Structures are given as structure tokens and as C-alpha cells.
Curated annotation (Swiss-Prot):
Residues spanning the signal sequence: 1-24
GO terms for biological process, alphabetical: anther wall tapetum development; anther wall tapetum formation; pollen development
Reported function: Required for tapetum and pollen development.
Record's miscellaneous remark: Plants expressing an RTS antisense construct display interruption of tapetal development, resulting in deformed non-viable pollen.
Species of the source: Oryza sativa subsp. indica (Rice)
Keywords per UniProt: Developmental protein, Signal
Signal is among the record's keywords: yes
Keyword NAD assigned: no
Name of the protein: Anther-specific protein RTS
Taxonomic superkingdom: Eukaryota
Amino acid sequence: MVRVAAAAAVLVLAAAAAAAAAMAAEPPTDDGAVRVAAGLTKCVSGCGSKVTSCLLGCYGGGGGAAAAATAMPFCVIGCTSDVLSCATGCSTSL
């Protein structure tokens, strides 16, 4: 269960990073140069840091084994939801 949750979280981060990479490069200008939107990259990087902290909080949550096993899926789902909202906010705020 924990490995599935961790794999799902990694997949979400990979999807967010791929979306950011796809949107980070602006189309070429008149001089043919492609300029990278540094603000978007910085925003998505911040989302990655937040989700990492969130997931570490899920795994280090304390409590008994039964309580941790019950709470873990909900914690990971919350982190996943948060990172998707964060990444979406990055693309709309620039």
C-alpha cells in the first residue's frame, strides 16, 4: 500500500514536471530566440518542494501502526490534490 502511494505521488510529480517543461518555453520571437519562462519553472519547483514536505509528513506521521495504515492513503491523496492545485495555479498565474 505504501509503495503504491509513493509510486502514485512520483507519477503526479512527473506529470507536473512534464507539464511545466512543455509550457516553460515560449514560442520563438522575431529574432528566432526561444526564451524560457523562469517564473513558471520556479513556481513548479516550489510545488515540488511542498509536495515533498507533505509526503514526508505522511510517512513520518507518528501514531500507532493501525492508525498510520488507515491515515496514510488519505494523507497521500491530500498531497496529490495539493500539488495538482499548485501546478495548475502556476500555469494560470503567469
